[in-house]
C-alpha cells in the first residue's frame, strides 16, 4: 500500500527509475558486438585467405609455364591442398557465418592446411636426398593421381611430369616445397585466428 502510494504520489521517481533501466539496457546493447558487423569481419578475413590461395596457385602456374619448372606428383598434391583451402575460405566468405559456423569453417581450413603442410614436409624430405627419387616415381600418390585422372580436371594446373627430388628454384635459400610449407602454416594459423578476431569488440 505504501509502495502504491509512493508511486502515485511521487511519479518523478517512477520515471527516473524507468529512465535508469532504459539507459542500462542501452549500455548493455552497446557493449555487445553487432552480429552483422562480426559476420562482415569474418567474411573479409575468409575472402583474404581465398585471395592468398589464388595468388599462390597463380605463382605456381607462372613457375610452370613461364619458368618451365614442371611439377611433380607431390607438387600437384600441394596444389590440391591450396585449392581445398581456398574453396573452404570462399564458402565461408559467401556464407557470412555466425560464431558456430565460423569455428566449423576454421576447423576445416586448419585440417586442409595441415594436410597440405604434411605433403610439403614429405616433399622436403624427398628433396633432402636425391637418392630418394625412387620413392616418388611409381609411388602410391602417383598411382592415386593417375587413377583419379586429376590432371584432366584442370590440365594446366594439375598435370605433372617433373621429378620430386630436384631443386630448380629457390628464394631466400628456401625451395618451392619449403615455401609451400611456410604458406600452409601461415594459412592454418590464420584459420585458427579468425574465430578470435571475430569475437573482438
Give the positions of each predicted feature.
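Short terminal hydrophobic/aromatic SLiMs and anchors at protein ends
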Residues: 5, 15, 22-23
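Short, Lys/Arg-rich, polar N-terminal cytosolic tail immediately upstream
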Residues: 25-39
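Interfacial segments of alpha-helical transmembrane regions
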Residues: 39-49, 97-119
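C-terminal TM-helix exit segments that contain a strictly Trp-centered aromatic cap at the helix terminus
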Residues: 59-64, 115-130
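Non-cytosolic membrane-interface motifs at loop->transmembrane helix junctions
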Residues: 69-79, 105, 137
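Extracytosolic (periplasmic/ER-lumenal) interhelical loops and adjacent juxtamembrane/interface segments
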Residues: 129-172
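A hydrophobic membrane-anchoring alpha-helix module
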Residues: 156-201
Amino acid at each position: 500500500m505504501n509502495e502504491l502510494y509512493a508511486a502515485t504520489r511521487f511519479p518523478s521517481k517512477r520515471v527516473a527509475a524507468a529512465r535508469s533501466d532504459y539507459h542500462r539496457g542501452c549500455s548493455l546493447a552497446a557493449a555487445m558486438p553487432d552480429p552483422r558487423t562480426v559476420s562482415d569481419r569474418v567474411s573479409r578475413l575468409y575472402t583474404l585467405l581465398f585471395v592468398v590461395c589464388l595468388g599462390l596457385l597463380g605463382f605456381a602456374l607462372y613457375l610452370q609455364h613461364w619458368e618451365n619448372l614442371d611439377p611433380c606428383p607431390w607438387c600437384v598434391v600441394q596444389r590440391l591442398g591450396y585449392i581445398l583451402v581456398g574453396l573452404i575460405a570462399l564458402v565461408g566468405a559467401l556464407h557470412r557465418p555466425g560464431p558456430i559456423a565460423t569455428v566449423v569453417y576454421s576447423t576445416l581450413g586448419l585440417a586442409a592446411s595441415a594436410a597440405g603442410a604434411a605433403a610439403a614436409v614429405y616433399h622436403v624430405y624427398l628433396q633432402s636426398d636425391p637418392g630418394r627419387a625412387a620413392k616418388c616415381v611409381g609411388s602410391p600418390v602417383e598411382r592415386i593421381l593417375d587413377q583419379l585422372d586429376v590432371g584432366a580436371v584442370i590440365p594446366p594446373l594439375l598435370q605433372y611430369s617433373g621429378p620430386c627430388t630436384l631443386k630448380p628454384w629457390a628464394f631466400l635459400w628456401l625451395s618451392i616445397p619449403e615455401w609451400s610449407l611456410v604458406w600452409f602454416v601461415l594459412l592454418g594459423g590464420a584459420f585458427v585466428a579468425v574465430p578470435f578476431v571475430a569475437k573482438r569488440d
